[in-house]
Swiss-Prot record:
Catalyzes the NADPH-dependent reduction of L-glutamate 5-phosphate into L-glutamate 5-semialdehyde and phosphate. The product spontaneously undergoes cyclization to form 1-pyrroline-5-carboxylate. It is found in: Cytoplasm. One of its GO terms (biological process) is L-proline biosynthetic process. This is Gamma-glutamyl phosphate reductase. CDD domains: ALDH_F18-19_ProA-GPR. Belongs to the gamma-glutamyl phosphate reductase family. The gene is proA. PANTHER family: DELTA-1-PYRROLINE-5-CARBOXYLATE SYNTHASE (PTHR11063:SF8), GLUTAMATE SEMIALDEHYDE DEHYDROGENASE (PTHR11063).
């Protein structure tokens, strides 16, 4: 680590801290004006963003990156439209800052309010998803936080082009341009500086990327972290499930987009309906281009599958691969999920209410779904506008991290001259 990088990052932290103060008291109208102007700027810069993305994609191809990686990196007309729409959706959300979460009166006449406040400065470290630049910048802005963005070198051109549009939004609303900053160096030493907190400037770190990145952040960070290590998501088909529904959900949960953290990685089927449900579901997946890795029982019923290893049950493929096992009803599903899950997202297809109740009560994951695809594990789908990530820990934020999760709170106590005496 060079002294120059430490100095550069210290200056980034200083600017962010300075910008956080006026941003914390910005009006909802100011923040929304900045967000809508940023969305306009992204659409106006569409050609520049696509050209920048082509440079990143060319480098990815040159470096032989996996198809799932390239998918996460790729921008097109529709995805740019979606980025702009996501920013506008965030602008329509209620302003969390200043919201009174709870209030009560004490016998001595004191009136107490618990009120949402910004966290301060958020550091976001991510890899190949250029859309995170927009999502993180917009969410932090709406919640009154300054943000320092450190994208991976693989998406550097795309992220820089999107970042320029975000700054235009800030300037249009007369908000500090330094409220959203992108780390100006690609050296990994910059990440190390962020994990130290930049001399107290950073209040929380949000990593969004692969297992090695998140593990490093959790290991080295000297500030709080909102993180998930991986998305080992399960889909359980119960004996009470409607087969047509199960087929639709299984195909979507795995194959809609295989490279996202909400994609199903393991399919569990109730042994009681294996003879009727397994082959149609796996046939759909195989026809869609998915590789099936099954337990010995699955292979006996579906010989086209490949043998699953012990490692498969704890692997996040992020690819067109799924591991499949038969289980003894809801009890077997709960046991398997609690053993192998990363506590991200699990789904059940079932019509029996008691079975669904057990699934919801006995599985400790951030997101649980009934009769719906795991791919709904997304802040946008939850009505949050977008998300900065999905947290699987239990402290402060859990599940999609949207504007509310990017706030803290303080107490306002109103009296009329009371003393304790």
């Amino acid at each position: 680590m060079t002294k120059d990088i430490a100095q550069v990052m210290a200056e980034v932290g200083r600017k962010a801290k300075a910008a956080a103060a006026p941003l914390s008291i910005a009006t909802n109208e100011q923040k929304n004006k900045a967000l809508n102007a940023a969305a306009d700027a992204i659409l106006e810069a569409r050609a520049d963003i696509l050209e920048a993305n082509r440079l990143d994609l060319a480098n990815a191809e040159k470096n032989g990156m996996a198809a799932s990686f390239v998918d996460r990196l790729t921008l097109n007309e529709a995805r740019i439209d979606a980025i702009a729409e996501g920013i506008r959706a965030i602008a329509t959300l209620p302003d969390p800052v200043g919201e009174v979460i709870a209030e009560w009166d004490r016998p001595n006449g004191l009136h107490i309010e618990r009120v949402r406040t910004p966290l301060g400065v958020i550091g976001v470290i991510y890899e190949s998803r250029p859309n995170v630049t927009a999502d993180a910048g917009a969410l932090c802005l709406k919640a009154g936080n300054a943000v320092i963005l450190r994208g991976g070198s693989d998406s550097a051109h795309s992220s820089a082009a999107i970042y320029k549009a975000l700054v235009k939004g800030l300037e249009a609303a007369n908000l500090p341009a330094d409220a959203i900053q992108i780390v100006p160096v690609t050296d990994r030493a910059a990440v190390g500086e962020m994990l130290k907190g930049l001399g107290g400037a950073i209040d929380v770190i949000v990593p969004r990327g692969g297992k090695s990145l998140v593990a490093r952040v959790q290991s080295e960070a000297r500030v709080p972290v909102f993180a998930h290590l991986e998305g080992i998501c399960h889909l359980y088909i119960d004996k009470s499930a409607d087969l047509d529904m199960a087929r639709r959900i299984a195909l979507d949960a795995k194959m809609r987009r295989t490279g996202i953290c909400g994609a199903a990685e393991t399919l569990l089927v109730d042994r009681a309906v294996a003879s009727t449900h397994l082959a149609p579901i796996l046939g759909d997946l195989a026809a869609g281009g998915c590789e099936i890795r099954g337990s010995a029982e699955v292979l006996a019923l579906y010989p086209a599958a490949k043998p699953a290893t012990e490692e498969d049950w704890s692997t996040e493929y992020l690819d067109a691969i799924i591991s499949v096992a038969l289980v003894d009803g809801i009890s077997g599903a709960i046991d398997h999920i609690n053993r192998y899950s990363s506590h991200h997202t699990e789904a059940i297809v079932a019509e029996d209410a008691q079975t669904v109740a057990r699934f919801f009560n006995e599985i400790d994951s951030a997101i649980l779904l009934h009769n719906a695809s795991t791919q709904f594990a997304d802040g946008g789908e939850f009505g949050m506008g977008a998300e900065i990530g999905i947290a699987t820990g239990k402290m402060h934020a859990r599940g999609p991290v949207g504007v509310e999760q990017l706030t803290s709170f303080k107490y306002r106590v109103r009296g009329s001259g009371q003393v304790r005496g």
